[in-house]
């Protein structure tokens, strides 16, 4: 599978995971919507100076593939508003605790995201990767930042990350070149692997959010 195939499986799964999250914590439907409305109406900065946008807020969904996934995001939303009683308010300021938690949960490891989609680039490609996650996201309007209930996104790399996150900005020129390239080295030899005589076993989660088990 290539990166596009992977995301065409995982974006629908993320919509399903978001639905499960809201079913477990119905109060967070309103909270997440209120946070997104605030982020769309005015500029909000994280403690490190990075802008907190709706797209970055949606990336909290990366937790949905682990434990305690739903609980961790619920705890973050529980402290979102300065009034402190957990109620949603588009007129309230977002709390320092919330902003710090979102920053920690969505801050990128600098070498992880630049390589993320290229693990699927095994040798010469017929077409460039060209920001696979962003392209597939465009096929799913339900992930737009102004859609309610707000859908969260999973483990996916988007071009805005290399503009908004200071740790990733130095990689942007290289990413712009690589995303249009089709010439990559061979990561693995499929023919040699097919001839392997050493018994191997692998396990995968049935409903893995990151790489669909059907692939």
Regions found by a protein language model. Name each.
Residues 43-181:
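Alpha/beta-hydrolase fold active-site neighborhood
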Residues 2-40:
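A catalytic-pocket lid/entrance helix-loop region that shapes and gates access to the active site
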Residues 196, 201-204:
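Short beta-strand/loop motif that positions the catalytic acidic residue
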Residues 1, 200-201, 209-210:
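Conserved catalytic-core segments centered on acid/base and nucleophilic motifs
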Residues 65, 204-206:
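Short, flexible loop/turn elements at secondary-structure junctions
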Residues 69-72, 209-214:
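Conserved alpha/beta-hydrolase "acid-adjacent" motif
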Residues 192-197, 211-212:
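A structural signal for short secondary-structure junctions
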Residues 181-192:
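A short, acidic, amphipathic alpha-helical segment used as a generic capping/interface helix at domain edges
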């Amino acid at each position: 599978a290539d990166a596009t195939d992977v995301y065409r499986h995982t974006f629908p799964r993320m919509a399903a995971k978001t639905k499960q999250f809201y079913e477990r914590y119905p109060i967070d439907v309103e909270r997440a919507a209120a946070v997104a409305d605030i982020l769309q109406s005015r500029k909000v900065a994280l403690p490190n100076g990075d802008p907190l946008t709706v797209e970055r807020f949606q990336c909290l969904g990366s937790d949905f593939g682990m434990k305690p996934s739903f609980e961790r995001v619920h705890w973050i939303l529980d402290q979102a508003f300065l009034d402190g009683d957990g109620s949603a308010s588009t007129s309230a300021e977002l709390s320092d605790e919330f902003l710090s938690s979102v920053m920690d949960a969505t801050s990128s490891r600098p070498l992880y995201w630049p390589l993320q989609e290229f693990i699927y680039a095994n040798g010469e490609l017929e077409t460039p990767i060209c920001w696979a996650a962003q392209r597939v996201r465009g096929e799913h309007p339900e992930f737009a930042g102004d859609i309610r209930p707000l859908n969260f996104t999973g483990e996916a790399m988007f071009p805005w990350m290399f503009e908004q996150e200071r740790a990733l900005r130095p990689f942007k020129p290289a990413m712009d070149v690589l995303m249009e390239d089709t010439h990559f080295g061979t990561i693995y030899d499929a023919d040699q692997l097919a001839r392997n005589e050493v018994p191997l076993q692998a396990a995968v989660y049935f409903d893995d959010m990151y790489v669909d088990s059907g692939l």
